Amino acid sequence: MIPLPVAAANSNSNSNSNSNDEESPNLSTVIKPPLKKTKTLLPPPSSSSSNRPLHLRVSIDNNNNNNAPPPPADFSDHQWNYPSFLGTTTRKRRPSSVKPPSTSNLRFDTIPKTKTKTKTNTNTNTNTNTNTNTNTDLPPPPVPSSSPVARPQHHNHRSPPIFYLLIITCIIFVPYSSYLQYKLAKLEDHKLHLCRQSQIHFSSGHGNGKISIPIHDASFSYILSRKAALYIVLFTLILPFLLYKYLDYLPQIINFLRRTHNNKEDVPLKKRIAYMLDVFFSIYPYAKLLALLFATLFLIGFGGLALYAVTGGSLAEALWHSWTYVADSGNHAETQGTGQRVVSVSISSGGMLIFAMMLGLVSDAISEKVDSLRKGKCEVIERNHILILGWSDKLGSLLKQLAIANKSVGGGVIVVLAEKEKEEMEMDITKLEFDFMGTSVICRSGSPLILADLKKVSVSKARAIIVLASDENADQSDARALRVVLSLTGVKEGLRGHVVVEMSDLDNEPLVKLVGGELIETVVAHDVIGRLMIQCALQPGLAQIWEDILGFENAEFYIKRWPELDGLSFKDILISFPDAIPCGVKVAADGGKIVINPDDSYVMRDGDEVLVIAEDDDTYSPGSLPEVLKGFFPRIPDAPKYPEKILFCGWRRDIDDMIMVLEAFLAPGSELWMFNEVPEKEREKKLAAGGLDVFGLENIKLVHREGNAVIRRHLESLPLETFDSILILADESVEDSVAHSDSRSLATLLLIRDIQSRRLPYKDTKSTSLRLSGFSHNSWIREMQQASDKSIIISEILDSRTRNLVSVSRISDYVLSNELVSMALAMVAEDKQINRVLEELFAEQGNEMCIKPAEFYLFDQEELCFYDIMIRGRARQEIIIGYRLANQERAIINPSEKLVARKWSLGDVFVVIASGD
């Protein structure tokens, strides 16, 4: 009988009696003893041995020796949860370092327990202590394994259904293939047996010779090779699925074989392989083609091996049949046998898949190439072309002028690089509905700030580069132009042509020239238009003349060297060109300085070039000197300037520069009325920020009025009938698009005209200081005054399509700002030297283009040729370049028949280049 363990918790006599009572009951009557799970805490290291709890011991030899040594204190308390006859506990055991028990004694030690509280309450808790001692847990049987390592947790990984399907397929087909191999071996044995029975006997000279065909060894080796092929095919079929499922365990297996421990967290092998494939297909352009080639070769080899395993032919024959099945899926129709048909159908299916992949690759390659061409990503291989960087509203008129300039050479090539889609750019150019006359326009999508995109359009081989201003504000646009110039200077191959940069602010021009050097030519668009509007306000009709000179449709400026003119004075050179009009000289001795309207005594030297106005660069040449008649002509001095009253409707960014130009042109006592929606205090701040000293103006007086120019009530508050000139500016403070700006200007123009016509009875109150300086008989001024009730109205028009509305109504002289700027850019792109000519003619100092009446040069109905009038103009230090008859609408610049005499009237006017000093 095995005694139950007794816990000696106390040293009193009750513990002994309880211990004796526990040994008396019969074990057969005990079904399930009361159990009590106890938890014991490890004593602190500093506790003495006297405070340690007593430990229980079970002796196998039924020896109740109370003097036995105490068991070790490292036994787990969970082993006392159940008696030994109830089986082991289901609770997870803690790792233990206890050695296996010996055959003599078996000891179960618990973790040292803390003292119970029954020691302090002996009298009151006697029953509690008794029950506690009686219901002490029984130890379980010893643990079979003494390993301290915890049992690994098994994770239930569910395999994919296709893996089980593959296993079932292999289980079915492997016995079947073995059966076929067995049957084939029997047939081979039967065949060998028949061959041995039909041995061939040959008779020779000394006896009978018997030669048998050694078929057995060959048949055996043939069967083995087919078996090996079959096993290779089956293994190859199973291998991808095995790799897919267990590929991530491969590094662990390798580490185990190498006896190394890699505790670092690493990316799974499947993800790493997928990443490498992704990188391979992304970096190398021919990766897809190589993958398709590898798949084709693998299918041919694998299919040939499978055919060799199920057919009786050779391996070479099987590979050839495999290729035919891949190339043509219909070749397997004549196959015989189940195995051969299954393999041939599989190979044909793979061939169809490879063919579909090949079609996809070819289609993708063609689509990618077409998209590249459509999106403008391919390189432009051109020479001597004009490159335009950027996109703006001026591009249409710029392309038109460049196409007209290239007409004489049979056309050219213009390349546009902008940050827009190629299809969108081509669509916008198509909407221009303009005949480019043999000039090709190539659009490319890209950024002018990127060197790769600049090289894509052959920037180093272009004969001229035009940088357009963006639609942003002035500072941002000029900053972007500066970055583009820096990108152009960074081209390693260098630039062959010059760079024309459209600037928005005159203050930023020196910085761009400093960065670009001698290759940079700047055109300050806003400044040019502002000065031109001032000149047109003072001299109506001048806008049409500038439009004819700047455009390539009529006469324009050219500079050329003529050695046969060396030694001649400028007075003789002036009448030496039948088809051109000399305007100046490029002095070689002065560093190539261009002198406009030089003295008559200037003599041409070696290296000097002549500046002329001609139809084209190849339509003029010097001829013999004609005989001209200077004669007697009236010497009328220029009339003194009178004070004028001018109205500005709208606000421009460079309005401070326009005021300074008016200060230089107008007589003292003039008034400038400014009518716009900008508050008066803000106007003063903007004018001061632009460098204008309002209190330092001597000739003009500023009058501020605030209002909306398209509201009739606001316009009626102005004395519109008293102004000499009215300038309608493209109001940048209100509108930001070309169409809206022109609509606003046109509405303001119509309202002013209607208000002036209603105030017609009060027109006598108008100032009598109408411009009389040489224009008392000017038909243009008279027509403009009659059309707009004695006020000259100048409208700034951005869109050329709006010009027709203004010109047909004959209510205003217009200024095409965008088109004139485009003409200037095109002219400077063709010849950068012309930029210095335009800068001087647009400036308030130096020579200028103006309109003079005929009474300065001739008498009424006097018959003279154009050369005679040119000689008379030299007496006033002027160069006459054209005229407008009284009965005509447009002026004629550089007339063709200069020696033909005709009668002139005092209603005619002449276009001259004169000094403004």
From Swiss-Prot:
GO terms for biological process: monoatomic ion transmembrane transport. Changing residue 322 to F: In pollux-5; no nodules formation or arbuscular mycorrhizal symbiosis. It comes from the Eukaryota. Residues 413-435 form a coiled coil. Belongs to the castor/pollux (TC 1.A.1.23) family. It is a multi-pass membrane protein. It is found in: Nucleus membrane. Pfam families: Castor_Poll_mid, Slo-like_RCK. Induction: Slightly repressed during the first 2 days after bacterial or Nod factor treatment. Homooligomer. Its main location: nucleus. PANTHER family: ION CHANNEL POLLUX-RELATED. Residues 383-524, 643-792 form the RCK N-terminal domain. Keywords: Coiled coil, Ion channel, Ion transport, Membrane, Nucleus, Transmembrane, Transmembrane helix, Transport. Residues 78-89 have a biased composition (Polar residues). The chain crosses the membrane at residues 160-180, 230-250, 290-310, 342-362. Residues 1-154 are annotated as: Disordered. Mainly expressed in nodules. Also detected in infected and uninfected roots, leaves, seed pods, and flower buds. Changing residue 530 to E: In pollux-7; no nodules formation or arbuscular mycorrhizal symbiosis. GO terms for cellular component: nuclear membrane. Ion channel with permeability for potassium. Involved in perinuclear calcium spiking but not in cytosolic calcium influx. Required for early signal transduction events leading to endosymbiosis. Acts early in a signal transduction chain leading from the perception of Nod factor to the activation of calcium spiking. Also involved in fungal entry into root epidermal cells during the establishment of the arbuscular mycorrhizal symbiosis. It comes from Lotus japonicus. Residues 7-19, 119-136 have a biased composition (Low complexity). This is Ion channel POLLUX.
